[in-house]
C-alpha cells in the first residue's frame, strides 16, 4: 500500500473512531461499501448499516447489500424509501435528489436514534464536489458526516484501497438511482422506473458493464463504455436489444455515440433558472 494512502486511511479510521457509534447509509456501491468497511474496523459492533429500498433501487443492489452485511456480520436495517410519495418528487424537479436524500436521512436518523446512535455517515467522496449534487445540501442541513470527503479521498483511491482489502466492490461500476435516467421535468412513475430497470438488467445480462439507459419519452438512449461499442453493434446483439426494448414499451432505441458518462442529464441543466 502506498505510504501516503496508508496515512490517509489511518486518518479515516481515527476520524470515525472519534464517534462512539455510527449508522452508515449503505447502498452497496463502491464508496459506501468502503466506508462501511472502515467504520466496522474503527467501531467494531458499534456500527449499523441502513439501506433504503424503493422502485428506483434495483433488487440486485439490495441483494448485494444484504450479502455484504451477512459476510462481515454487520447489523443491517432496510427502510422503504417511497420517494414517489414525497411531495414534488415525481415531477422530477432540479432538486429531486435533495428531496429524496432529505427524506432518507431523516429515516436513517430515526432508526439510529432507536438504537442510541447519534452519528450518521454517508459515502460521498472528493470527486463529487465537481458535479451538480443537490443531495449534499441535505447532508449539510441534517449534519450528516461525510468522512471520505472530509479526509479527501478520491474515487480512484477508494477503488485502490478496496482492492487492497479484497472488497467485492473494488471494480464495481458506478451506480446512480434509476430516477436519474429521466430529463428534469419529465414525470417519474413506478412503471417508467421498472422499464429502466428491465432495460439495464438486459444489458448487464448481455455482458455490458458500465452503462445507463436514459429515457426521452418513447426513446431509449443507451450509454455504454465506447470500448464495448463493437460488441453492441454485433447484429445478433442489436437485434435482441431492439426486440426486447420494444417489448418494454419503447418506440425507438438509440446508442449514444459519446458513450457512458455520469450525470449526462445535467449537461443541459440551467442552474440559474
Question: Model-derived features: where do they sit?
Answer:
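A short interface-forming secondary-structure element
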Residues: 215-217, 221-234
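Mid-to-C-terminal catalytic subdomains of enzymes
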Residues: 122, 149, 153-155, 159-203, ...
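Short, low-order "capping/linker" segments at domain edges
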Residues: 263-273
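A structural preference for short, hydrophobic beta-strand core positions in alpha/beta folds
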Residues: 78-80, 213, 257
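A short linear hydrophobic-aromatic micro-motif
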Residues: 208-213, 252-254
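Flexible glycine/acidic-rich beta-alpha junction loops that bind and position SAM and/or redox cofactors
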Residues: 174-186, 219-223, 260-265
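A short amphipathic beta-strand at an alpha->beta junction
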Residues: 247-262
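ATP-dependent adenylation/nucleotidyltransferase module used to activate substrates
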Residues: 1-164, 205, 220, 236-250, ...
